Amino acid sequence: MEPFKIHILGCGSALPTLKHSASSQLIEMRGKCFMVDCGEGAQMQFRRSHIHFSKLNAIFISHMHGDHCFGLMGLLSTLGMLGRTSKLRIYAPKDYEPLFRQQVEFFMQTMEYEMEMIPVDTEKQQVIYEDHSLTVETVPLQHRVPCCGFIFREKPTLPHIRRDMIDYYGIPVSQINNIKNGADWTNEDGDVIPNARLVQPADSPRSYAYCSDTRFMPALKEQVKGVTVLYHESTYTSEQEDRAKIYYHSTARQAATIAAGAGVGTLLLGHYSARYNDEKVLLEEAKAVFDHSILSQEGMVFDVV
């Protein structure tokens, strides 16, 4: 099974604190590296992750609030100073495109790599990135500005070859791909060896949904149904539920309600309000509804399995 890792660079909310950095994550999957949100200081957290800047394939911005995007221009500038030459695609809400182009023209005139912004319609659930091994789709969220989440999904892989059976039946290497794709094997005596005897089931495709920032959306459980890991903002406890509704955020209990209803494997909590010196109160509230809840923390590397 190939590595599928979530690096938490920042899990705080809008008000800066000495404890938490602004929202940002790195997703490692299928040999690629994607950044989700890029709050102020994200590139410093990037360095602490021990992932080389050159491995960054694309950046996805959920919405245009500063704690999710103020680090973008600094990061793009650093990539240029480090000698990046390959194109970098930035997926962000479509309203950002004019400002993005102005910022690039003003700050990035000497950069020797191409930056392409892909405008995203945050009101549609759609695949915005696809390659041979994975897809990234948007999930509309309810916030004070256009906002969407992202679901990273592995594509199904071929079954695993049973090496013992290949050796036992003397099947040549040239036939391995055919067998992986479902072919039976006929030996010299004309006996047909069924494919099921020659392979083991493929690993189940894994998935990760990132949902921040959003008001409580009961319907969201259908959009993230069955994902392996769900990151859902948990800015407040239930004592601040009215405040969460006003500012289009969620409580830890509401995040856990989505996780339980969607049947996800694990819930990662994050986007903590600066009012909480100890986020355990958020964790306790979430675990009362969904036991497989975890507090995200800067420096955490979570394996999606």
Regions found by a protein language model. Name each.
Residues 30, 56, 82-87, 261-268:
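Short, surface-exposed connector motifs at secondary-structure boundaries
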Residues 40-91, 119-121:
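Active-site metal-binding motif and surrounding structural segment of the metallo-beta-lactamase
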Residues 121-269, 278-284, 289, 305:
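Metal-dependent phosphodiesterase/nuclease catalytic metal-binding core
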Residues 107-120:
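A glycine-rich helix N-cap at a beta->alpha junction
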Residues 291-299:
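Conserved phosphate-binding/catalytic loops in two-lobed NTP-binding clefts
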Residues 46, 72, 100-103, 220, ...:
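Hydrophobic packing residues within well-ordered alpha-helices of enzyme cores
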Residues 1-49, 85-87, 150-152, 200-211, ...:
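Conserved beta-strand hairpin/beta-sheet module of binuclear metal-dependent hydrolase folds
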Residues 36-39, 56-64, 93, 208-214, ...:
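Active-site neighborhood of phospho(di)ester-bond hydrolases with catalytic His/Asp-centered motifs
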